[in-house]
Each structure stands twice: as C-alpha cells, then as structure tokens.
Amino acid sequence: MKTGALATFLALCLPVTVFATTLRLSNEVDLLVLDGKKVSSSLLRGAESIELENGPHQLVFRVEKTIRLPGNEERLYISPPLVISFDTQLISQVNFQLPRLENEREASHFNAAPRLALLDGDAMPIPVKLDILAITSTAKVVDYEIETERYNKSAKRASLPQFATMMADDSTLLSDVSELDTVPPQSQTLTEQRLKYWFRLADPQTRHHFLQWAEKQPPS
C-alpha cells in the first residue's frame, strides 16, 4: 500500500465506537499483548495512552527500569512477562502504579513475587488478577501472542478464555463495529487489519504523529 493511500486509509479508520476508558501508558512498562493481540510497538512508541472499550481487558507486559548496582554502576532490569486482567466497566481511566525498584534486591523480590497496582482516575485501586506468563517456547524470538493464547486456555489466575478463542480468527480484530464482520477482500492483508486495529486504539496525538511519519515515507 502506498504511503499516501495508507495515511488516507488510516484517517478513515478513526473510531466510530465511543471508547470510555483511557489506559495511561508508563515508560517503565513494555506492553506486549493487549486482549490477546500482539501490540504494534512501532505505532504505539511514544504514545501516552490508548483508548479501550468498557469491559474486561488483559495486558501482557514487562517492567523495564534502570536499577543501581554496587560501585555506582547501573543496568537495565527487565522483569519476566506478566499477565494482568481487570474490568473497566465503570472506569474511565487506568494508571499503572509500580512498586519501588531501585536495586538488585528489590528486582529479585519482584521477580519472585511481582506486585503492582492499577489505579483509576481518582487514584483508587482497581481489582486485578496478576500472574507471571511462563514461556514454554524454546525459540530465540518469543511469540507472546501464542504464549498468551496458551495461557488463556489453561485456567490460570489471570486467564481470560474469551481472548484465547479470539486468536483463532483475526476477523475479530475490529470486533464490535468491524468492517471485518464480513469476509475481507484478499487485498486486505492481516498486516493491514492489525495496523488499523492499533491505529484505532491510539490516542489522537499518536495518530497525528504516525500519519505525519507515514506521509514522509517513500512509496513502495
């Protein structure tokens, strides 16, 4: 798809659904999977928030933070992948609240027993279920979407089976209002579907920045 056409295509994909929950992103949280779908890191890079519909949601993410070492040295701490499920039915904003992670001891404690909170717009805790996503694949590059599907089928603490069944059919990417309620034309590739999906979730500023970037790309 040529870049100009891509920008026009995405602009026409602005949500007709009324989203009611804003998920505020943290620069110390690397979001990997949202509601069973791999996150488009290129589209969301630098985004401050994404918009969600009211209802149950599930995030798979890692905490990434620079910690101090003895001798005034530092290193980047990366947590194991975590799964958190929650419901935004009556919530308009979701914010991450991470525990103190400043040194190796605190990082080790977090690895063994991760804990964090999600807060609403009034800084009140949101009920959550938190778990570690145990990776079964031995591949060098982990497919977190597949690992999340497996997790959701296993009746674990933070499993949401409805997101496991979605994995079988990518036509659910645009679930409620979807142009994909009917069979998509052959020209509409899975890449386009995913790009449209994440574009619709991004906040307005991120959409604007992405469209500016897309317009500057040479035609393919």
Swiss-Prot record:
Keyword Signal in annotation? yes
Keyword hit for Signal:
yes
Question: Which superkingdom is the protein from?
Answer: Bacteria
- Signal peptide (residue range): 1-20
**What InterPro entries is this protein classified in?**
UPF0319
Q: Which UniProt keywords apply?
A: Signal
Q: Which family is annotated? A: Belongs to the UPF0319 family.
What is the protein's name according to its record?
UPF0319 protein YccT
What is the source species?
A: Salmonella typhimurium (strain LT2 / SGSC1412 / ATCC 700720)
Organism taxonomic ancestry: Bacteria, Pseudomonadati, Pseudomonadota, Gammaproteobacteria, Enterobacterales
What gene does this protein come from?
A: yccT
